[in-house]
């Protein structure tokens, strides 16, 4: 299931970088000025109650650093996807639950950066995200040459209790346990325990994995049902990943701070 990146895949990495560069040159003036292209919105403007923990805008991710294009820690989505998320948030409120997003729209340049990172020698600094795998095996089934995130129709998220407790700050120097460990041993997160951390490259992160506890399985099922009820589709290898609507054109505009 997990295979090393082949020579054609390496060529795809170069193509992604070229596409990202061309997209940047053709980027609408509004995006360059700090606005958003037509059809895209800041989730905070549609559903301000949804918590945001934008992992690729900081160091708490499997690359250990902010990703290109994440100039602000803001969730950006196609309007229809954002409005559907707002409905999920309202549905969950009756159970004293809410959503927390980890990633939304992802510039194409960030997808290219993932692939370049995978080909570099492994220094083990972020091994907690892939405890059982060789770094070169990470992207089969997880991160493709083309991501629905770049189309603005995919979102990575989890459940939080309401009111959500404050999360302890992430310490990049700390020796956190692997993403498959008990929640108390993993990097801090104020979400409900879903059995693994976000971006955990392991079979245990598969939505229907049978080794998680009954409570963890119930929470995953609850999240999937709530999202499905508003038109989202779950990716079976990642309990946190959902997409909405038809495929769209991939984008590369940077995520800038809201005006």
PLM features per residue range, with description:
Residues 5-20:
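Bacterial N-terminal signal peptides that target proteins for export
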Residues 17-29:
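Bacterial N-terminal signal peptides
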Residues 32-104, 108-129, 133-236, 247-259:
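Extracytoplasmic cell-surface/polysaccharide-interacting catalytic and binding patches
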Residues 239:
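Active-site lining segments that contact anionic ligands and/or coordinate catalytic metals
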Residues 242:
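Conserved metal-phosphate-binding beta-hairpin within the catalytic cores
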């Amino acid at each position: 299931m997990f295979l090393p990146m082949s020579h054609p895949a390496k060529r795809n990495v170069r193509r992604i970088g070229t596409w990202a560069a061309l997209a940047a040159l053709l980027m609408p003036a509004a995006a360059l000025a700090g606005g958003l292209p037509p059809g895209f919105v800041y989730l905070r403007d549609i559903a301000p109650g949804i918590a945001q923990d934008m992992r690729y805008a900081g160091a708490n991710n499997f690359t250990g650093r902010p990703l290109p294009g994440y100039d602000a820690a803001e969730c950006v989505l196609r309007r229809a996807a954002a409005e559907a998320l707002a409905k999920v948030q309202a549905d969950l409120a009756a159970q004293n639950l809410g959503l927390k997003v980890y990633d939304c729209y992802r510039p194409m340049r960030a997808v290219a950066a993932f692939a370049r990172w995978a080909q570099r020698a492994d220094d083990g600094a972020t091994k907690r995200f892939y405890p059982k795998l060789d770094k070169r095996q990470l992207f089969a089934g997880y991160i493709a040459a083309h991501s629905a995130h770049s189309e603005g129709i995919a979102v990575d998220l989890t459940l939080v209790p309401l009111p959500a407790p404050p999360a302890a700050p992430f310490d990049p120097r700390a020796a956190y346990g692997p993403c498959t460990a008990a929640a108390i041993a993993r990097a801090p997160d104020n979400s409900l325990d879903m059995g693994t951390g976000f971006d955990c490259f392991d079979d245990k992160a598969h939505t229907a994995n049978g080794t998680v506890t009954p409570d963890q399985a119930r929470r995953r099922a609850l999240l999937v049902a709530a999202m499905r009820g508003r038109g989202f589709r779950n990716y079976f290898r990642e309990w946190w990943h959902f997409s909405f609507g038809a495929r769209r054109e991939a984008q590369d505009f940077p995520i800038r701070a809201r005006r």
